[in-house]
Amino acid sequence: MKINTLILILYSFVFFLYSQKLLAKYEITDPPECFNNKGETVKFQNMKSKTGKITIGIAKKDALGKPIIYRFNYDKSSKFLQKFIDYHECAHHQAGDLEKINLPLNSKDYLLREDMADCIATIRMKSNHLNAKNSILNTLKELKKAMKYIGFDELGIKRREDNILKCFNKNVSLKNFMEDIVKQKNIEK
């Protein structure tokens, strides 16, 4: 009887801790400076979803055709993941991805676009944070958990993690990396 009671108490305590983690609220960070490929300032708008359990960013054009990033449920993640998502979505504007046709989800070109945005975000995070390695590792930990939560398979999660780590280990400045991307995109035209 005492053992059953002890197990029940421990189980309840673990469940309580886990539920508190899901309910955790974080301070929403200020968005970074962001300009699109045309030099226009990208605006950020915080949004809340009552049912949303994870942080999501979406790069779009608003009703007037101006560049914007919608920041959903940023209070659900740490500053590391918030910054990474902001940088990733900003990268889509910087690279001119919104000027192109929408690509089929999970097509080769779509995945290359996402890899590039992750790479730009990683290099930007690396150049803007004193303890960059810790920032990236914390980001990856949260990002992998969120990806698993929304249904990504292990292979997709591992692929993204490997790309982010590969980009982190690049010895290149953000400015030079962006210049290379612009040159590459001009060649592809």
Regions found by a protein language model. Give the residues of each.
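Classical Sec-dependent N-terminal signal peptides that target proteins to the secretory pathway
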Residues: 1-24
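Auxiliary, metal-adjacent structural segments of Zn-dependent hydrolase domains
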Residues: 20-64
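Sequence contexts marking disulfide-bonded cysteines in secreted/extracellular proteins
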Residues: 33-35, 118, 166-168
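Active-site scaffold of zinc-dependent metalloenzymes
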Residues: 45-79, 90-99
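Soluble non-cytosolic domains of exported or imported proteins
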Residues: 76-81, 85, 107-115
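Sec-exported extracytoplasmic/periplasmic mature domains
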Residues: 91-99, 118-130
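Post-HEXXH active-site segment of zinc metalloproteases
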Residues: 96-118
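Long, well-structured alpha-helical subdomains associated
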Residues: 127-189
